[in-house]
Amino acid sequence: MKKLQEAHLRKPITPDLLMTPSDQGDVDLDVDFAADRGNWTGKLDFLLSCIGYCVGLGNVWRFPYRAYTNGGGAFLVPYFLMLAICGIPLFFLELSLGQFSSLGPLAVWKISPLFKGAGAAMLLIVGLVAIYYNMIIAYVLFYLFASLTSNLPWEHCGNWWNTELCLEHRGPKSGNGVLPLNLSSTVSPSEEYWSRYVLHIQGSQGIGRPGEIRWNLCLCLLLAWVIVFLCILKGVKSSGKVVYFTATFPYLILLMLLVRGVTLPGAWKGIQFYLTPQFHHLLSSKVWIEAALQIFYSLGVGFGGLLTFASYNTFHQNIYRDTFIVTLGNAITSILAGFAIFSVLGYMSQELGVPVDQVAKAGPGLAFVVYPQAMTMLPLSPFWSFLFFFMLLTLGLDSQFAFLETIVTAVTDEFPYYLRPKKAVFSGLICVAMYLMGLILTTDGGMYWLVLLDDYSASFGLMVVVITTCLAVTRVYGIQRFCRDIHMMLGFKPGLYFRACWLFLSPATLLALLVYSIVKYQPSEYGSYRFPAWAELLGILMGLLSCLMIPAGMLVAVLREEGSLWERLQQASRPAMDWGPSLEENRTGMYVATLAGSQSPKPLMVHMRKYGGITSFENTAIEVDREIAEEEEESMM
């Protein structure tokens, strides 16, 4: 990789050397696209958008369960360690790439066109996730509307969707307290409401025969996409204002649920169950892997959302400070959500007379079965149910804004002349296409397809993308050069901590996660349903497709160059001639070349087009590159 970094230092820079064959058309490089691309209207827009993107549904329904099953309070030790080793450095790397270049996940690979396939893989992953994520928002909308009643519909048995196994677990009292119930032989009204009414899963014969479309879910999904479209209609200028509400209001609701939860009888029992340290769990590698997975997915690294949001920043936005605010805020929110969830579960376990571990679940089972059942035990249950699902709605929408903005930005940056003036129309077409592709999720067996997408769309493929990104930036482009870019942007170079993580610790951690996910692979399942072999194969191919986009992109990049294979690799790995800050005023240092007698420095590629070749002695960029190479040689000695 070092040879690839230094290959371009051996020749004087000429237009033919800097331009790929596809770049050699008659293009006016003086055109400035930064102004009409748009920016955040304020620094707080970006910060709240990042908080809303990271603080999502997983903070409520995954972290608390993961914590209590992996050592309780002891889980926080590997959690914060993995945050420091993997989460914060990768978060900062992705923000730095986006802000420095003002480009989306595809165009940002001007940094090294050889790896543009990683950007395409990001888009595939985020597209698949956006399809099923909005279905979860549709479920939330369904429950939100169902909460607008005097009595919650999942509170009692006796409805047409209930079976003879339905039992209202009210905790029958004995003289000394609560009689324990055998929950394994009965089904709660909330569980039958979810599976038999909302999903109507009994109408499906499996993933291969999903049954009919549920019109109520179909309408909820349509409403979810309409909301998303309206919020991203004007890009970050509209979504940046919506997040002032959607990123902050969940904290108010979470605080209300927390206060209500801790005042319930039995709440302390649930909190103890959640946070009592069990340090012997730290001896298990599984706990450390689970902590790393939680960090990796909760921060949204590798989906392109962080890169996209940062690309709309001004060049000198302090993303170093923002990185710590968002990542630590995300961690604290997860812990607080655990208190709100387990305080209510403790109350529920006391009312039912069963241990907390019999009522605690993760994922949709917590959001759509257990917590709704707990709400029925509270006074003013529709009010608390509405608040809970409204919180989930706002948490989900923030993340969905990022997913859609990532796709729209990536494609419009690739075709700015055609799509940027019609960005709103293009956004609408994307929403319509994804709504149509998501209709299979509204069928009786739609949950099976949702589980398949959730298990495979962003699994090992996402890890491969992030590892590739990390290595391409730090090893091929060069850690010294990348740190100089950050210095130009922020006024300081990242220290030893970030360099060590980018070069060694973060890739090693991700590689361990990748190996673990492959070795510990388990077939998908939903309840007692086991997926057929063809569905498992489809899921694996889904994950492999994103991985295969990386070598496919390399092949395309190499074929576009000329010369021998090694020369093509050198040229394809070299930064594109127009790589750098988008605004001419920010092109300083290695991105400016001053000709003898010139009164005003111009961007390097403008000089190359107007004045021809520049020898290495007159080229500031090449002098800086040589200085970088010398520093790297000294560090190796």
Curated annotation (Swiss-Prot):
SS bond partners: none
Q: Where in the cell is it found?
A: Synaptic cell membrane
Q: Which residues lie on this side of the membrane: Extracellular?
A: 138-214
Just give the chief location class.
membrane
Reactions catalysed according to its record: L-proline(out) + chloride(out) + 2 Na(+)(out) = L-proline(in) + chloride(in) + 2 Na(+)(in); L-pipecolate(out) + chloride(out) + 2 Na(+)(out) = L-pipecolate(in) + chloride(in) + 2 Na(+)(in)
Phosphotyrosine: residues bearing it:
Y591
- Membrane topology classification: Multi-pass membrane protein
Q: Which UniProt keywords apply?
A: Amino-acid transport, Cell membrane, Glycoprotein, Membrane, Neurotransmitter transport, Phosphoprotein, Symport, Synapse, Transmembrane, Transmembrane helix, Transport
**GO BP term, example:** proline transport
- Residues bearing PTM Phosphoserine: S22, S573, S582, S598, S600
**Presence of the UniProt keyword Phosphoprotein in the record:** yes
Query: Which terms in the Gene Ontology molecular function aspect does this entry carry?
Result: L-proline transmembrane transporter activity; proline:sodium symporter activity
Q: Which InterPro entries match?
A: Na/ntran_symport, SNS_sf
- For the Cytoplasmic compartment, the record's topological domain ranges are 1-45, 557-637
Q: Which GO terms describe its cellular component?
A: synaptic membrane
**Which residues are reported to carry the modification Phosphothreonine?**
T20, T588
- Please state which protein family the record places this protein in: Belongs to the sodium:neurotransmitter symporter (SNF) (TC 2.A.22) family. SLC6A7 subfamily.
Q: Which PANTHER family match?
A: SODIUM-DEPENDENT PROLINE TRANSPORTER, SODIUM/CHLORIDE DEPENDENT TRANSPORTER
The free-text function statement in the UniProt record for this protein reads: Brain specific sodium (and chloride)-dependent proline transporter. Terminates the action of proline by its high affinity sodium-dependent reuptake into presynaptic terminals.
Protein name (database record): Sodium-dependent proline transporter
Species whose genome carries this gene: Mus musculus
